[in-house]
Amino acid sequence: MKYLGLDLGSRTLGTAISDNTGLIATSYKTIRHNEEYERLLSEVKTIVEELKIDAIVLGFPKNMNNTIGPKGELSLSFKEQLEKTVDIPVYLQDERLTTKSATDALIMGNVSRKKRKKVVDSLAATIILQTYLDKKGR
């Protein structure tokens, strides 16, 4: 199975894809959307069709106390819209601290601030997807 990982931010969507075996996640690209969700859904649908994706894993931001805040509500709403747009399963994956982990990894790798801004969302999507794949494989 081939998966698409998504990290939905307020202005960008980080994406990652798995290999055909569903074992390894790789950063794909970052899509700027500026809250134009209809266009964003269309772009995701195109990716799903072009790359022959079997399922989507969407990052689900929960608060540290396990409650669902405004960003979590946005992800739930986006998941509903995705399910209406693509005819494949959409799974939620807890994404707490993934962007921080991605940023920390880039800083440790001496990646410049300018470059970090371009890749942090797709790296966060990769972490989200790899976490899901690892959990699924157990």
Regions from the language model: what does each represent?
Residues D7:
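Conserved catalytic-loop position in the HRD/HxD motif
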Residues K2-Y3, L13-R138:
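Phosphate- and other anionic-substrate recognition elements at nucleic-acid/protein interfaces
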